[in-house]
Design a protein with these regions (language model features):
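RNA/tRNA-interacting regions in translation and RNA-turnover enzymes
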Residues: 1, 5-357
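Short "domain-exit" segments at the C-terminal end of structured domains
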Residues: 358-362
């Protein structure tokens, strides 16, 4: 049926499609009931909705007006569920993961666990080789002075950066995870963190003095300004990321104001590292700053994930046209962590369980 609905804000509609709610309905954002009323002396049987009233973040819809009615795509069919048309009809599962199961702090980890639980085949994501014919070693040098606190440090580089909003599908998945979309580069690092459970950080290459990265502890009494503009007092137990002249980040916690990504950035260094969990937990407490990254690091991450995660980020950068990936990777990994294997006697287990299901191939 047809209903008259008057907008509060000025809006030009020439056969356009809008999200509307009619008398007796409710807004998906806060459940407010929609009632028939009069606006400027004219009866209105409903309302036209903004993206916020539909329960969406306006950052996900850069074409939406600052305030006012959101115009739906022209191919939208009148009468369709607007929430579904905008891709907001989704199911989100929340898991309460105990601290000893850091392997499940990611989508891949949950998928692997579900495959084992329900006896399904787990297929890991396919990460393709990325990068041009250049060599990252011609651009950047990395040195780790404390391999106990940083057992692995991977770095890759991207030039000709093209900052833009990330695609809607990525924004929706991040929003469902409670992460606000920012731009394609930031969103990719957050997306990979949710996917692999591996935190990443991006540095502005042109702001790295000497075009080098040095991982070492701070000096007692050092003061460092983090990305949030706050000054943090350091001591010699706190691991820092440095360039050739200065500190540019608190390892595993937050980067510095002096190397942040700005809109005019052209070249970036992507860090994917493994830091000592206990040290990160104590450092976060000392500087009074706990982040999503530090929360993951302090549980104790698998260093073998670092390389695959940064390669996955570079793959997404190429697929989304966000920049040109420079060939090669810098991987400082002096003592490789081997898989732990537990020997067992399959015949004895079968005998004790009165079963023949296990064999030595397991």
């Amino acid at each position: 049926s047809l209903h008259d609905a008057l907008p509060i804000f000025p809006v030009v509609l020439d056969g356009g499609r809008v999200a509307g709610g009619h008398d007796g309905g409710a807004l998906p954002e806060d459940g407010i009931k929609i009632k028939k009323g009069k606006l400027r002396g004219v009866e209105s049987c409903g309302m036209m909705c903004s993206v916020e009233e539909l329960g969406a973040d306006r950052d996900m819809y850069p074409d939406a007006p600052e305030s006012g009615i959101y115009i739906l795509p022209k191919d939208s069919v009148p009468g369709e569920d607007a929430v579904a048309v905008m891709g907001l009809r989704d199911v989100v599962f929340e898991y309460e993961i105990t601290s000893n199961r850091v392997d499940c702090y990611s989508v891949i980890g949950i998928a692997r666990e579900a495959a084992a639980t329900f006896k399904k085949t787990f297929t890991a994501p396919s990460v393709t080789k990325t990068g041009n014919d250049e060599d990252i070693n011609d651009y950047l040098k990395v040195r780790v002075e404390n391999s106990r606190l940083c057992p692995r440090y991977c770095a890759r580089m991207v030039k000709n950066i093209r900052l833009a909003p990330s695609p809607r599908w990525m924004q929706r998945r991040l929003a469902a995870s409670g992460i606000r979309p920012i731009n394609n580069i930031v969103d990719i690092t957050n997306y990979v963190m949710e996917e692999y459970g591996q935190p990443m950080h991006a540095f502005n290459y042109d702001q790295l003095a000497g075009h080098e990265i040095i991982v070492k502890c701070a000096k007692d009494g050092d003061v460092f300004q983090t990305l949030d503009g706050q000054e943090r007092k350091l001591d010699s137990t706190i691991l820092m990321i440095n360039d050739g002249e200065k500190e540019v980040g608190i390892a595993g916690i937050m980067g510095g104001e002096n190397s942040k990504i700005t809109d005019d950035v052209t070249t970036m260094v992507f860090e994917s590292a493994c830091f000592d969990g206990t040290n990160i937990r104590l450092s976060a407490k000392k500087v009074g700053l706990r982040t999503d990254a530090s929360g993951k690091y302090e549980k104790g991450l698998d260093p073998n994930t670092a390389e695959e995660a940064v390669n996955r980020a570079c793959q997404l950068i190429e697929e989304l046209g966000a920049g040109e990936v420079i060939g090669g990777i810098i991987d400082i990994y002096p003592v490789k962590k081997e898989d732990k294997r537990i020997p067992f006697d399959a015949a004895r287990i079968n005998r004790d369980r009165k079963s023949t299901r296990l064999n030595s191939s397991h």
